[in-house]
Amino acid sequence: GLGDVYKRQAQNRAIDCLKVYAHLAKVHQVTKTLAVATAAVRTARNGSSFLKRVHSAANIPMTIISGKQEAALGFSGVIHTIDTSEFLLFDLGGASIEISLVKNKKQLHSVSIPIGAVSLTEKFKSSGLLSAAKIKHIRSYIKSKLQSIPWLPKSPIPVIGIGGTIRNLAKIHQRYSGYPLSKLHNYKVSSQGLF
């Protein structure tokens, strides 16, 4: 449900999911919850009306957070479970990517760029396989967005990815390489292993 409008079908799926979470919170006697909406809702013209529907249907008040807040939450979720002190952290979502530069386990810089897995798919729609020229065009587009970030390191440092897209890529890599476990947390792939 990306683009100018958060589509009704996508809204309904999200509301159904949130109803399940609301039920689980009630069953487990959770007294305080925090539900946030990220880039897909943030950029949709009907994002605030969707939040009203969520509140009405699932009795969950939601807040739209900024890209900086989204990056900060991702950092908070990672920093205490990763044994690396300097790295780039990225969260590739459906509508955006959040990138943070971490040094000495501190988030020095962060940015949210409106390029996500779903938004890129919609922007560069193709029927069937992508041609080499189209792939080159997509890479050029992404590279231009990344080059606008002045604090990105010029020399290689570890990159840590979080979110659904990264989980799926890790699962594909595990299957492809014959990895014997299904554990994803702290799963490592070399840059050569990606290609």
Predicted regions and their residues:
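Conserved catalytic-loop position in the HRD/HxD motif
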Residues: 91
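Early-domain small/polar-rich strand-loop-helix modules and first-structured segments
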Residues: 1
